[in-house]
Amino acid sequence: MSKKMDRCSFCGRTEREVTQLFQGPGDVFICDSCVESCHSLLRDDMYSLAREYENLRDGKSSNNKNYKGKIELLKPVEIKAKLDEYVVGQDEAKKVLSVAVYNHYKRILNNGQDDDGVELQKSNVLLVGPTGSGKTLLAQTLAKILNVPFAIADATTLTEAGYVGDDVENVLVRLIQACNYDIPNAERGIIYIDEFDKIARKSENVSITRDVSGEGVQQALLKIIEGTKSQVPPEGGRKHPNQELIEIDTKNILFIVGGAFEGLEKIIKARTNKKVIGFGAEVQKQDNMGTEGEFFKKVLPEDLMKQGIIPELVGRLPVITTLDNLDEQTLINILTKPKNAIVKQYQKLCKLEGVKLEFTQEALTEIAKRALKRKMGARGLRAIIEHTMLDIMFELPSNNNIKEITITKDTIDNYKKAEIEYK
């Protein structure tokens, strides 16, 4: 009686028909050909993003119909006018950003067209301003106006490669994911890094200990911000051996970084010899020092270095602009003037329920005053209105008899119920 011949459990071929047959638990076998087939399937899945990337790079194909090879560039005046529709105040910052963005994308469109040997450098932007002054909103609105990919990164979560936290290169992954892995589109996008001041090194002197979330992050950001070809994992996270990586060129990515830079005012005061304490003439100087915003307008690169930003990184952020503290009237305007103002948003929500929503002028003033007390800028406005509207939005969908709701000063100040007009 002949011996039973072993077969591959997947394709059914006998051991004579294959080069090698591997045995698993029990009588399960797999041949070398099936192993290779499984490996090919896994490899194709892992490399699919990379292949699409290569096709996009070579101009062969693109599955992303939203990608537009031609950038429709607005003039600086037009960019600022668009910003005015969404952002209240901060005119100086809007002008600086409009010019910087125009020059940046003009540089991209003109790249390689001139033969005079003049190479236009990238002008990344640093926004200095208090919490809630509109730094993030300005960056978001710019990306929306220009129809380019946009990603936000929080600098406080970034650490040097190899340590717990997000690798700096993960900010590039967010941008790639924001445009559905369309690499050429990502390579002309905008990245906003918030809380940039939080990665300042602990002192001006070079430390003998490793500062993985401060100077270490700054060093890692240097090349990315200046322009380099980075290898990043498609899904982010840490790099692993044998992992397929996607290459992205950052030379045409505009980086906008922002921070409150608490303590910068004192550094500027010290440089301009206007002392916080003193007698006689010095007291007179202190009385005429102006507001915090006016001092920020005098910021120089050397002040940022004293704050803990390394000189090399300061040099890669040539455009520096400051944002003003928001006063009461500006906060009131923020509530009602922009296209997507928070009051307009709630009015639309109520309109969808068939109800008219109104805020009295006294109520708007009280909201602005409360936001000023909280020292949260425009962010405080949303928090106050969200709290005020909570009960109303909870009950409104269940009540079909309401015609109009009016939010008064007492609704804000004394937590009284809003005035309701029934049908």
UniProtKB/Swiss-Prot annotation:
Domain named ClpX-type ZB: residues: 1-50
Binding site residues for ATP: P130, T131, G132, S133, G134, K135, T136, L137
InterPro entries found in the cross-reference section: AAA+_ATPase, ATP-dep_Clp_protease_ClpX, ATPase_AAA_core, Clp_ATPase_C, Clp_protease_ATP-bd_su_ClpX, ClpX_bact, P-loop_NTPase, Znf_CppX_C4
Keywords: ATP-binding, Chaperone, Metal-binding, Nucleotide-binding, Zinc
UniProt-listed PROSITE patterns: CLPX_ZB (PS51902)
A single MF term (Gene Ontology): protein dimerization activity
Binding site for Zn(2+): C8, C11, C31, C34
Assembly, per entry: Component of the ClpX-ClpP complex. Forms a hexameric ring that, in the presence of ATP, binds to fourteen ClpP subunits assembled into a disk-like structure with a central cavity, resembling the structure of eukaryotic proteasomes.
Purpose of the protein: ATP-dependent specificity component of the Clp protease. It directs the protease to specific substrates. Can perform chaperone functions in the absence of ClpP.
UniProt family annotation: Belongs to the ClpX chaperone family.
Protein name: ATP-dependent Clp protease ATP-binding subunit ClpX
Gene responsible for this protein: clpX
